[in-house]
A protein has these predicted regions:
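Long, charge-dense
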Residues: 58-107
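A short, acidic, amphipathic alpha-helical segment used as a generic capping/interface helix at domain edges
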Residues: 101-116, 124-128
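Short, acidic/small-residue loops that bind anionic groups at enzyme active sites
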Residues: 71-78, 131, 135-153
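Gly/Ser/Thr-rich loops at beta-strand to alpha-helix junctions
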Residues: 25-29, 51-59, 80, 122-130
Length: 174
């Protein structure tokens, strides 16, 4: 309780908005709508979307929905166009010297400069989402967590007998 007694006004605003949306939308609204309602309840007017190029269509559709209510800035993961080979990074296709790295630091910086008040992740890679969150000046929430194997539904691994067994046994886990 003491941590909330010492929370700043911004944190308490987010805490109240989150509780309000949880109470009103519990088991009623999809996450896409919860984010809209949360942003409104928190008093935000400028939202950011950091998205994976592989989910560009989903990001476009969500941006379209958000633009009816907010100012929106969005940034694709490949924004800086830096080849992985220049930084000595592992590549998906080692034969391609121009394979471009994802750039969560650039995404965060661009949305910071745009002055977004809440940033929404759409399918950033594991690790890239952590870097983006670390460097974002605004609070961050996720609409889509990338999972190429399970249709961007990572919780399915916990419900699926097959994947749960593999995860528990360490099969395929280095």
């Amino acid at each position: 309780m003491e941590i909330y007694a010492n929370a700043d006004a911004s944190d308490m605003n987010l805490t109240r908005a989150a509780a309000k949306i949880e109470a009103q939308g519990y088991m009623r609204w999809p996450r896409a709508l919860e984010i809209v309602r949360f942003a409104k309840a928190a008093g935000f007017s400028h939202l950011g979307i950091a998205f994976c190029v592989g989910l560009a269509e989903e990001a476009r559709r969500y941006r379209e929905l958000l633009e009816k209510r907010f100012r929106v800035s969005s940034v694709c993961c490949k924004v800086c166009g830096i080849p992985k080979s220049r930084l000595g990074l592992d590549q998906i296709r080692p034969e391609d010297p121009e394979e471009v790295q994802c750039a969560p630091l650039c995404q965060a910086e661009m949305l910071n400069r745009a002055g977004t008040e809440l940033n929404i992740l759409i399918g950033l890679c594991v690790g890239h989402d952590a870097l983006f969150t670390k460097h974002s000046s605004a609070p961050v929430t996720a609409l889509v967590a990338k999972d190429r194997v399970l249709g961007h539904n990572p919780a399915a691994a916990l419900y699926s007998q097959y994947w749960r067994k593999r995860l528990l046994s360490g099969d395929g886990v280095p």
